[in-house]
UniProtKB/Swiss-Prot annotation:
Algogenic for animals, human and insects. At high concentrations (0.5-1 uM), it acts as a pore-forming protein that forms nonselective cation channels both in cell and artificial membranes. It is weakly selective for cation over anions channel conductance is identical in both directions. At lower concentrations (1-10 nM), this heterodimer inhibits cardiac L-type calcium currents in isolated rat cardiac ventricular myocytes. Disulfide bonds join C12-C34. It comes from Ectatomma tuberculatum (Selva ant). SUPFAM superfamilies: Ectatomin subunits. This is Omega/M-ectatotoxin-Et1a subunit A.
């Protein structure tokens, strides 16, 4: 499913720093979605 942009805007400040330190599918997905904002 698609996560609404409003949710990404809320969670990116929290999860993006984590994602940048990690690798793997989930971290890559987070970095890609947060990068679109």
């Amino acid at each position: 499913g698609v996560i609404p942009k409003k949710i990404w805007e809320t969670v990116c400040p929290t999860v993006e720093p984590w994602a940048k330190k990690c690798s793997g599918d989930i971290a890559t997905y987070i970095k890609r979605e947060c990068g679109k904002l």
